[in-house]
Amino acid sequence: MILNKALLLGALALTAVMSPCGGEDIVADHVASYGVNFYQSHGPSGQYTHEFDGDEEFYVDLETKETVWQLPMFSKFISFDPQSALRNMAVGKHTLEFMMRQSNSTAATNEVPEVTVFSKFPVTLGQPNTLICLVDNIFPPVVNITWLSNGHSVTEGVSETSFLSKSDHSFFKISYLTFLPSADEIYDCKVEHWGLDEPLLKHWEPEIPAPMSELTETLVCALGLSVGLMGIVVGTVFIIQGLRSVGASRHQGLL
């Protein structure tokens, strides 16, 4: 299976910025993946990205033949010629066709993706937030991610990353949904992949503290009142004892 993955991925170049300390035990502080590309016989046919510490720097749109930066401000300081990516994709296509002939078109094994949904910030009703759907262990890199609100498809405020590479040659992908948390809205991240027998729905809804019952509120108020009265009584006792001590001291002084 790993062999099949390696054949499909094509060229993968990794550059690591290594820690200056340590001789035998060298640890990478940062890892940049330059020219991560794959080509496959099913859509999307391929992808070319640059990554840094697991985050996407940019990808090359193979249809428009343009470099698309994850953070557009980076394009002011550095540039990348998309023709280099197109050449890599041509090599990947040729390599894939050759290996398919050599392997009698044996397909790679479909992995079962893992899905996690969480909010970017602590949830406060009515305050803007972002839902994050992390789809991990993707192989092959073909997946549909859809957001549902109360069972209905949502398209506004949705964005997603490219397929991001992992050391085991699988991929992960992240989908984002900007939204206003509401007590009467629930959300699902719907994932479709060849490794699943049916679409997977990962449920999310805001966690709202349950309101206290009238009995609980009464008990809390009574407890607070009792503690307050006890504090007054104890304070009064201490004041009386203090006054008596002062009076006794003065009496002894006169004697």
Swiss-Prot record:
Residues 24-217 are extracellular. SUPFAM superfamilies: Immunoglobulin (SSF48726), MHC antigen-recognition domain (SSF54452). Residues 205-217 are annotated as: Connecting peptide. Residues 241-255 are cytoplasmic. One of its GO terms (molecular function) is MHC class II receptor activity. Residues 111-204 are annotated as: Alpha-2. Glycans are attached at N104, N144. Restricted to skin Langerhans cells, although some expression at low levels may occur at the surface of B lymphoblastoid cells. Disulfide bonds join C133-C189. Residues 1-23 form the signal peptide. GO terms for biological process: adaptive immune response; antigen processing and presentation of exogenous peptide antigen via MHC class II; immune response; peptide antigen assembly with MHC class II protein complex; positive regulation of immune response; positive regulation of T cell activation. Residues 24-110 are annotated as: Alpha-1. Heterodimer of an alpha and a beta subunit; also referred as MHC class II molecule. Dimer formation with HLA-DQB2, but not with HLA-DQB1, is required for efficient exit from the endoplasmic reticulum (ER). In the ER, forms a heterononamer; 3 MHC class II molecules bind to a CD74 homotrimer (also known as invariant chain or HLA class II histocompatibility antigen gamma chain). In the endosomal/lysosomal system; CD74 undergoes sequential degradation by various proteases; leaving a small fragment termed CLIP on each MHC class II molecule. This is HLA class II histocompatibility antigen, DQ alpha 2 chain. The lineage of its organism: Eukaryota, Metazoa, Chordata, Craniata, Vertebrata.
